[in-house]
Amino acid sequence: MFAKDAGKLMKAALLGLLLAAGSLATGCGGGASGKTLDIADIGWTENTAIAQTTKVLLEEEVGYEEVTVHTSDLDSVYEDVAEGDLDAFQDVWLPNQRHLLSSVEDDVEQLSFSYEGETEQGIAVPSYMNTTSLDRLNESEADLILGIEPTSVVMGQVYDAVIPAYGLEQELVQASTDGMLAEVEKRYRNREEFAFIAWSPHWMNQRYDLRYLEDPKDAFGELNDPARITAIVNEDLPEDDPVAYAFMDALILDEDQLNDLESTINEAGDPLEGARRWAEDNPEVWQPWVQAAQDAQ
């Protein structure tokens, strides 16, 4: 009789432990368990970094079943978010992309700024060159301006306005961002004279000693004005998924944090693995974002 009773007690205790463990596992995901999210990555370095970090934290800390990062482009991403094909795009530069945002503003919601600072972009040179201004670039030995994707706003401005304004004799080279950065790395190591499209925030500002060239004729126009980085979500997301909405609205990085995140990804050679390594090393940065998501459950 005692053995039978002891067996029942042991089974009851084991069942209690299993239920408790199940409760804890459910509690980790809470209201996020089973949820999915679709976010955009247009291939810009900061977009990739933020999107992959969002995926890592929502899946591993908040409990989402899957966050899918979709390859997109600037020409279609706004419409895709507005139509609900994508839930969010986290690399909106304002005022640079104001015209794109205006076309869908009734169908999307803009979140809080995700970058604690202002951007900078233009043509840069390594600091070992003596050139400080665009009107003196022809006096250097640089024969190339290493560029990025031809569809980018900055490339269009360089081709249509900057080169004619200064009579620049350098060839403007079109390439992917990764291709340009590989060429910058090679030429910088060889201490060659060259110019290239540069912007901040980006890990290049941490890796290279570079100088943004002055633009006395204001040929870059509005691109000379500092921009802010924010995110947009489909108008239905705040109601359909308040957890993801709260997380992305709370997400914010300063210049050092974003440069460090991008550098970690670059060194890892894989965006997802790099984002995971950065998250492991910087819990104090992202814990408020996760807390905001948990509070919304």
Where do the language-model regions lie?
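Short helices/loops that flank or line small-molecule/ion binding pockets
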Residues: Q52, L57, D75-F89, D178-I197
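A conserved helix-loop-strand patch within extracytoplasmic ligand-binding domains
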Residues: D106-V153
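A bilobed periplasmic-binding-protein/Venus flytrap-type ligand-binding module shared by bacterial periplasmic
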Residues: E120-T131, A227-D241
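Short helix-initiation/N-cap motifs at beta->coil->alpha
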Residues: W44-T45, V67-E79, L172-E183
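C-terminal motif of bacterial Sec signal peptides marking the signal peptidase cleavage site
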Residues: S23-G27
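A ligand-binding cleft/hinge motif common to bilobed small-molecule-binding domains
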Residues: Q90-V104, K186-L213
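Ligand-binding cleft/hinge of the Venus flytrap
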Residues: T54-G63, E141-V173
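Short, well-ordered beta-strand elements
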Residues: S33-E46, T54, Y64-H70, A142-L146, ...
